[in-house]
Amino acid sequence: MITHLKRGQQLLLRHLSTAPPPLPRPPPIADRRVVVTGLGAVTPFGHLQPTWEALLAGKTATRTSTQLASSDLALPTHVVASIPDSFDPAPYLTNARAQSVPFIALALAAATEALQDAGLITTNHDETQTVTENDNHHVLSVPERTGVAIGAGVGSLAEVTSSHTTLETRGLRRLTPYFVPRTLINLAAGHVSMKFNLRGPNHSCATACATGAHSVGDAYRFVRFGDADVMVAGGTESTIDPLSIAGFSRVKALSTGFNENPSVASRPFDKRRDGFVMGEGSGVLVLEEYEHAKRRGAKIYAEIRGYGLSGDAHHITAPASDGRGAIQAMKSALLQSGLSPNDVAYINAHATSTPMGDAIEARAIHQVFHTEVQGLASARESLLKVSSTKGATGHLLGAAGAVEAIFAVLALHHKVAPPTANLHDIDDDAPTELNFVPLEAQPLSNDARATMTNSFGFGGTNASLVFGQI
């Protein structure tokens, strides 16, 4: 017995002497401030800078898809908002066979841009390197404290359909072993994690069109409660393919009345709206604990002040007619932020250009911000600017919430509200206390304190984010 104990002690000591060093101890759980230090996106306008410039100029990116228009499937819409043909994913890929599926490639591109914008990496034609601080300490040299939260709503139905065709026509041995990794939604986050050696929380959610906002909100909580010091967070999507278009057409979600004039097909809050335009892209934000960001002298765009989420418990595709889920999400985000309705200068609405959804959201916003809501400070005293940038970009599904969170951050940072494109004739019963920013960008007050973004998805899933001036 004693011999066995001594041998066990020797094995334990040998293991301890060769074991890797312990992981860094996380800070005690507390409410830590979380700021936005990097932004990256790929949209139907291109990367982030040309996208923002196009938004403010009132341009639209919706156009005719020659693939859909020439298809013999008799699809009811040919209008999409696709990534520019000039976009080249190759520089962002480290394993083209595994990463070339568009929703993964777009996430890698947006994450690279966001990390570079945050000053955490430098890039050249051949490699990506971490940036060093003045004391030669790598900002990302504690990879366990930096994580990823990137989701997608659908992923790649095109990969599924093409692989099924390969299996049926050419047999099992011709099916690529990359099929499953190309279609798993969490592999967008996985590839970003692997490319940049980020070993903190590796998280991916799939909440339909609220995915991007939920990913940012979840990442905010990871930083706030000490699971990470830095999070790379957002959403990605690429579903412009015949099966996706057919599927969304069957639930009567897509615009079908503007095939001859595609640039005006997406028209949130407008009387002639008849459905959304399928878009694609990716948006990524770098979220960082405030003191961590200050220590390294990071540029800070805004602070995340609130994150509200809810469920309608109503219908698989339609929102509750009383807007209860949207109201609860917005109210929760506001209460968490500690701000009053008067502090919010601009809302980037989810409004996708559907007849029902836009009207319900407008009434919900009005109820939260212009009527007395239990638990909130007094109602607003002035018009609230509310716009939907989907009139310009189309609907990016799982990427929409992240891209539009970026727009809300930039609206606060630059003190300007991007317009609602194609909004010529507002609903007669639209709340008159809301300024829907039709056609042209409008300035925000220099003392604007906060902005909000809403994202809602099939199944009644809702998310609202509040960004505050730092």
What kind of feature is each model-predicted range?
Residues 235-272:
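Phosphate/pyrophosphate-binding betaalpha-module
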Residues 33-37, 63, 261-337, 345-346:
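Condensing-enzyme catalytic core mediating Claisen C-C bond formation in acyl metabolism
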Residues 20-31, 118-151, 164-177, 194-202, ...:
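Structural signature of cysteine-dependent C-C bond-forming condensing enzymes
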Residues 36, 59-207, 236-245, 341-357:
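Conserved beta-ketoacyl condensing-enzyme motif
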Residues 8, 12-96, 118, 291-303, ...:
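ACP-dependent fatty acid/polyketide chain-elongation machinery
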Residues 44, 154, 208, 352-354, ...:
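Glycine-rich phosphate/pyrophosphate-binding beta-alpha loops
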Residues 212:
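Short conserved active-site loop signatures built around small residues
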Residues 46-48, 159-163, 216, 241-247, ...:
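Short acidic, glycine/serine/threonine-rich loops at helix termini
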